[in-house]
Amino acid sequence: MEIRFYLDPETGQPHTYRHGVNEVEVEQVLARPLEDRPGREWSRVALGQTRAGRHLRVIYVPDPEPGSVFVITAYPLGPKALRALRRRRRRKP
């Protein structure tokens, strides 16, 4: 999968860095999301866990080209969102 990142105009680095999330962590979540659902407008929201155990929310837009996405931002899940994710995961058969 090809992953492009929104670059922060101030730093020239991926916007995810502002939230303490690097490219490898985003790739790990997108490769095996626990949830992937529609977001606002054309975006999608992937929730998942990195190999290091961090739970992240990744906001992205699928590119017209198959197998390619544009990541807008990503950040760690807060305690309330993490509890909700775990509750939803328990309910699934």
What are these regions (language model features)?
Residues 1-93:
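Ribonuclease/tRNase effector modules and their secretory precursors
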